[in-house]
Curated annotation (Swiss-Prot):
EC number: 5.4.2.11
Pathway involvement of the protein, from the record: Carbohydrate degradation; glycolysis; pyruvate from D-glyceraldehyde 3-phosphate: step 3/5
Superkingdom field: Bacteria
Species: Polynucleobacter necessarius subsp. necessarius (strain STIR1)
UniProt xrefs under SMART domains: PGAM
Catalytic activity: (2R)-2-phosphoglycerate = (2R)-3-phosphoglycerate
UniProt-recorded name of the protein: 2,3-bisphosphoglycerate-dependent phosphoglycerate mutase
Length: 229
């Protein structure tokens, strides 16, 4: 049996403020930090151990992983940081309050942007200061790989190369994998692992800071999965 544990980062400052976050690099709230520590405690009490960890290049996920590692006495654990595990890029909506955006564009339009599988939000302009090209952590990416806004379909297509090239081989080699990322990058993996339809995946919500344990067979097909809280 192969072991994969997925954790969405703890509550972030913009989660609390009800803003579209995406690739904006906001930090955890005190509550979010506590959620991360609690996740580590629950994993430790349940006897989980890990050989490698994966996370995004955004601090709310990285700090969540640090707190889990610290609680589990696993600060030595090898960690792979990848932009492919970043949150879905919300384009020109980044930083906007969700309720105020709904007032401006209408509830139905915002619902489509948030919950449609293949409809992108309004894209960033190339001159926008929020463009990822202005961030040094993405300086080595090809310009064609840098999103200006993503739907969940784009997010799935971004995450799967990392799964196929790194995470899946690690699992098949017997490594116990901890992955700390974001709501939509984790939903992308859930969709792939559980073969969830395009329609049904839109109703899947991933809670902050609660470990989602997958037990997989040798072909990496799910035997069972459950939340550990």
């Amino acid at each position: 049996m192969k072991q994969l544990v997925l954790i969405r980062h703890g509550e972030s400052a913009w989660n609390l403020e009800n803003r579209f976050t995406g690739w904006a690099d906001v930090d955890l709230t005190p509550k979010g930090a506590e959620q991360a520590l609690a996740a580590g405690e629950n994993l430790k009490k349940a006897g989980y151990e890990f050989d490698v960890a994966y996370t995004s290049v955004l601090r709310r996920a990285i700090r969540t992983l640090w707190n889990v590692q610290d609680t589990m006495d696993l600060m030595w654990l090898p960690v792979v940081h990848s932009w492919r595990l970043n949150e879905r890029h919300y384009g020109a909506l980044t930083g906007l309050n969700k309720a105020e955006t709904a007032e401006k564009y209408g509830d139905e339009q915002v619902h489509i942007w948030r919950r449609s599988y293949d409809v992108r939000p309004p894209l960033l302009e190339h001159e926008d200061e929020r463009h990822p090209k202005n961030d040094p952590r993405y300086s080595k990416l090809n310009s064609s790989d840098i999103p200006l806004g993503e739907c969940l379909k784009d997010n799935v297509e971004r995450v799967l190369p990392l799964w196929n090239e790194s995470i899946a081989p690690a699992l098949k080699a017997g490594k116990r994998v901890l992955l700390v990322a974001h709501g939509n990058s984790i939903r992308s993996l859930i969709k792939y692992l559980d073969q969830v339809s395009n329609e049904d995946i839109m109703e899947v919500n991933v809670p902050n800071g609660i470990p989602l344990v997958y037990e997989l067979d040798d072909d990496l097909k799910p035997i069972q999965h459950f939340y550990l809280d």
